[in-house]
Amino acid sequence: MATKKKTFVLYPSLGVGHLIPMVELAKRFLAHGHGAVIAVVDPPDADPLSAAAVSRLATANPAIAFRLLPAPASPDAAAHPVKRSDDTLRLANPVLRDFLLLQNSLPDALVLDMFCVDALDVAAELALPAYFFFPSAAGDLAVFFSLPYFYPALPASFREMGHELVRCPGMPPIRAVNMPLTVQDRDSDPAKVRLRQFKRIPEGAGVLVNTFDWLEPGALKALKDGVCVPGKPTPRVYCIGPMVSDGGKKQGHECLAWLDAQPKKSVVFLCFGSKGAFSALQLQEIARGLEGSGHRFLWAVRTPPEEQGQFPEPDLDRLLPEGFLERTKEKGMVVKSWVPQAEVVRHEAVGAFVTHCGWNSTLEAIMAGLPMLCWPLYAEQGLNKVFMVEEMRIGVEVAGYEQFVKAEELEAKVRLVMETEEGGKLRDRLAVAREKAVEAIQEGGSSEVALVEFIRDLENRNTSSENGACK
């Protein structure tokens, strides 16, 4: 029997970084013949860049319906951003409820961002199935599920534990320093918010994860075995990735023309996400490391955090070592603030990627078969680094990332990846990972099968509900 067309309302958390993965998920639903509406919370204190991003994404994806939901701002303007965001999302519940009730018919399911846990209450009130979309690694999900249970029992906060090993159920030991920044201080407001959110995610009917079976067998086994949520049922996890942006239409950025003129796999690409900015001292050290390596490079540089209020665009001549741009002009290109990363990582001239270990960037590199130099900066990136280096073995760690990376370290790791036998083995592993990733999203692949199973399970759940049964 053919599956009926479903309509999904996707509900991202605040910020562009949470919206873009939801757009990729909506595209997958559309490709399978279903409808998707993305409801975006729009508080009065929203970042203007977010509103601009919504407009761009809506224009680029006319088949996806975008709806802005006006919501109250957090009542505590002085609170930590994590708490303000949590307050805003909770206060948005009545707006979300009214939006859903104003539709011609209720959607078949709500798909919630991992931080939108309070929307579970709206779903329950309207008898809607609610699923979570987790845009990061399955390993992160396994750790997040278990944190509310084992962290309160530890003798100290992660920050105090430093490099001590933390043992999460079903996962390899992880150093405390690599746990997410927001939970480093257990008694802080951000940690309390995150632990509350992580504890509620298993209340969903299931979790869609942007990964694929082959990449994370250990984490997926821990989730399937139910060891991450003690004493409670673990929702089904559907691995439906990798979902990455194709970059849209050809951007025509000058860096792409420069890459066209470089030999194959000769360029080291450095890009650290939309929030990745370094001090002036660290920028100088990176420059010296790149110059010392002798390899070609493409480097996206942002204004140091301490100067962003005064200088939106970086002053490269002032920030980088004297004469650096002139000395390296034949081999390197430094770009201010932004590059079309999705296109750059796929370019045949790029041979290595120095990354902040954001999961979307990691998946883009895997899809390009590109070895990574791992330099985590914030959020769950320290965890991702552990999985990438120690479990998946698709990257090498840039030592010193917690405080300050020296030029000699960056130079050594660039040479290791670009010149040595170890770098060649890393490249071989990435070639296999790329092949497995492509297989996963093809017809009959594990991720395509998982998405079909998700739709089938939803259909069975809705049928059971209509018949008055519980599942």
Predicted features and spans:
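Glycosyltransferase specificity loop/lid
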Residues: M1-K471
